[in-house]
Swiss-Prot record:
Residues reported in the UniProt entry to bind ATP 1: 43-50
Enzyme Commission code(s) on record: 7.-.-.-
Gene3D superfamilies hit by this protein: P-loop containing nucleotide triphosphate hydrolases
Matching InterPro entries: AAA+_ATPase (IPR003593), ABC_transporter-like_ATP-bd (IPR003439), ABC_transporter-like_CS (IPR017871), ABC_transpr_CbiO/EcfA_su (IPR015856), ECF_ABC_transporter_ATP-bd (IPR050095), P-loop_NTPase (IPR027417)
SMART domains (alphabetical): AAA
Protein name (database record): Putative ABC transporter ATP-binding protein TTE1589
Molecular-function annotations in GO: ATP binding; ATP hydrolysis activity; ATPase-coupled transmembrane transporter activity
Pfam families associated with the record: ABC_tran
Residues the record lists as binding ATP 2: 342-349
Record organism: Caldanaerobacter subterraneus subsp. tengcongensis (strain DSM 15242 / JCM 11007 / NBRC 100824 / MB4) (Thermoanaerobacter tengcongensis)
């Protein structure tokens, strides 16, 4: 066999980062990839997925140093002996933090950067720009600075800038992290079309399981090792294995594995297959138990307190003339847990920033605990409303966890004794006691996210706004974060959460407001809104598959557990 028989060959690859003395990031990896294959690599945070990706194009070991052994051969080229600049022609890598990849002053120049550096003639570059803009659906945005694009557009631009180098292999590291459900499908559709049309070899690293169905192969990684490599229809039925390693299993096979004695091979994977299997097995929904769930929901509705936040005819226009909010009317009652949903750029974050006075309406009014925000400031409203940003690193700045959490109470003039009490209380709430002396930036993303929440709790607000609290976290970390949020809500905090993760909305939120183009298009209890599946799709949203399955059976269940509890076998 010559070196170039396979598109990628990885032999006995082990790598340990300099700073990790006691643990290999990847260990004993053996992998072969055929030309034109579409592979999805999945695993929890810290499994070694991104490390493996960076070994494929030579960033490791050429830029990132550490202990490296084994061999990687890409299209017949030994990666360890080849500069990254040469490897970039063979394999393109779209980073997990795609914004870090964008630096040009407009979209066109961003796409041209790679070909220019490879000495491609100007006329050809013009043609490449045209072709790439069409592929990634950014036509008409040639002159827009990347900083003015939405998250989804930036993501597509990062993919386009890599495609412009015309690599034979495209590797994307968690390309859909910040995207709404339809945006995610869009990125996977682009990837699939490229794969089919251009015989491109495609490697996608993902936490999300739903879209992996379309791949040729799925590779599961855990603790730096490959633990499963097979066809999607085989791997995605491994419900127990996926839960064990910290990945979210598909909801449909999980449901049927709990309500039937089906062999793994016979488990349905999609809601369409699920409807058929439900009927085949003669399963039924217990009407009495379903009505009990609805009754408990009605009881909860009656338990909320007074209206504490009120938006009346709110409009907001940014300084560049963009109207971000257009006639918003919304009331939030004490004790509610409301999710703000909508496609990227629909106005969710702009609206949330009005609730703690970070922004003030251009027209209309926002009343928070009886105070008109037009006559208030962040400091005053901050006594009532705390805001955790999407990226915890935009919020964290202190050298120790203790000082980070103590900052708010100290600014409010608390005595050191009271500061100590509040820090202890906040750390207990987020389950991070004992971390007081740690450097926040040395913690994992999930831990930093919890520290950001703790620093808000220390100010003892009544309302907590969470902007994408689970972005970049794996399933186990997401569950842990959301159980914390649920506890905060149950202890009396009102929660306002912005998210794209639909299963989290289904399982944790009470109410939902769906936004598009600065307007609230749908509002109500989560179950009532998720019934309206066609309307949600029009608004770039897609409910979890267990909701889609149950809707087609005449009921709306919000979680696998809920549906299992009402299934008569």
């Amino acid at each position: 066999m010559t070196l170039s028989d396979k598109e990628i060959i990885v032999k006995d690859l082990t790598f340990r980062y300099k700073e990790q003395k006691d643990r290999n990031a990847i260990e004993g990896i053996n992998l072969e990839v055929e030309k034109g294959e579409f592979i999805v690599i999945m695993g929890p945070s810290g499994a070694g997925k991104s490390t493996l990706a960076q070994c494929l194009n030579g960033l490791i070991p050429h830029f990132t140093k550490g202990h490296y052994s084994g061999e990687v051969v890409v299209r017949g080229i030994k990666v360890k002996e080849t500069p990254v600049s040469k490897m970039a022609k063979e394999i393109g890598l779209v980073f997990q933090d795609f914004e870090a990849q964008l630096f040009s002053t407009n979209t066109k120049l961003e796409i041209a950067f790679g070909p220019e550096n490879f000495g491609v003639p100007r006329e050809e570059i013009e043609e490449i720009i045209r072709r790439v803009l069409k592929i990634v659906n950014l036509e008409g945005l040639e002159d827009r600075p990347p900083s003015t694009l939405s998250g989804g557009q930036k993501q597509r631009l990062a993919i386009g800038s890599v495609l412009a180098c015309m690599p034979s292999i495209l590797c994307m590291d968690e390309p859909t992290t910040d995207l709404d459900p339809i945006g995610k499908i869009g990125v996977f559709n682009i990837a699939r079309e490229l794969h089919e049309e251009k015989e491109l070899t495609l490697i996608i690293i993902e936490h999300e399981t739903e879209e992996a169905l379309n791949a040729d192969r799925i590779i599961l990684m855990e603790k730096g090792k490959i633990i499963k490599d097979g066809k999607p229809r085989e791997v995605l039925k491994e419900v127990d294995l996926m839960e064990k390693i910290g990945l979210m299993p598909l909801q449909i096979p999980k449901y049927f594995s709990q309500v039937s004695n089906l062999e793994k091979a016979d488990l349905p994977l999609t809601y369409e297959e699920g409807v058929q299997k439900f009927k085949e097995l003669g399963l039924q929904i217990d009407e009495g138990k379903y009505q009990e769930i609805l009754r408990r929901e009605d009881e909860r509705e009656k338990s909320y307190g007074d209206v504490i936040i009120q938006a009346k005819d709110v409009e907001y226009v940014y300084s560049n003339g963009t109207k971000a909010l257009d006639g918003i009317n919304l009331e939030i009652r004490e004790g509610e847990f409301i999710a703000l949903l909508g496609h990227n750029g629909s106005g969710k974050t702009t609206l949330a920033k009005h609730f703690n006075c970070l922004l003030k309406p251009t027209r209309g009014s926002v009343i928070v605990y009886g105070k008109d925000t037009k006559n208030s400031n962040v400091y005053e409203i901050g006594n009532y409303v705390g805001y955790a940003f999407q990226n915890p690193d935009h919020q964290i700045f202190a050298d120790t966890v203790y000082d980070e959490i103590a900052f708010g109470p100290r600014m409010r003039g608390c005595t050191e004794e009271e500061v100590k009490e509040r820090v202890a209380e906040a750390l207990k709430a987020v389950d991070m006691e004992g971390f007081e002396k740690e450097d926040p930036f040395a913690l994992s993303k999930g831990e930093r996210q919890r520290i950001a929440v703790a620093s808000i709790l220390a100010a003892r607000p009544k309302v907590i706004i969470l902007d994408e609290p689970t972005t970049g976290l794996d399933y186990k970390e997401q569950k842990r974060m959301m159980e914390l949020v649920k506890r905060l809500n149950e202890s009396g905090h009102t929660i306002i959460m912005i998210t794209h993760t639909m299963w989290i909305v289904a399982e944790y939120a009470h109410k939902v407001a769906v936004m598009r183009d600065g307007k609230i298009e749908m509002y109500g209890k989560v179950r009532d809104v998720f019934k309206e599946e066609e309307r949600l799709l029009e608004l770039s949203l897609k409910p979890p598959s267990i909701v889609s399955l149950s809707n087609r059976l005449g009921k709306t269940f919000l979680s696998v557990e809920e549906m299992v509890s009402c299934t008569k076998r």
